[in-house]
Amino acid sequence: MNSVCVLVAGMPASGKSRMARELSARLGLPMLSKDDIKELLYDTVGFCSREEKVALGVGAMEAMYYAARQVLGQGSSVILENNF
């Protein structure tokens, strides 16, 4: 089977995370969420200004894409959740 990247996107508070987690559980695929990564980064490094908050969000997106490329590069599939 070819590797697949499933994108779960939608408006804020529309149930993206819930749907992505359910898909992950049902399909046995890893799930990456920008918000989960951003929260981890915030807990680790924090931010003090709007500019730093934006940079944290960009960093979270880049980390999510990097992790997805690693998973896909090994021939596995992955679920990405964000408001893209």
Where are these regions (language model features)?
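Short catalytic-loop micro-motif centered on adjacent basic/acidic residues
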Residues: V78-N83
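Hydrophobic anchor at the beta1->P-loop junction of P-loop NTPases
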Residues: V8
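Exposed loop/turn and edge beta-strand positions of beta-sandwich/beta-sheet ligand-binding modules
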Residues: N2
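Conserved substrate/cofactor phosphate-moiety recognition/catalytic segment
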Residues: R18-Q74
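Walker A (P-loop) ATP-phosphate-binding motif of ABC ATPase nucleotide-binding domains
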Residues: C5
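Conserved glycine(s) of the Walker
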Residues: G15
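The conserved Walker
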Residues: P12
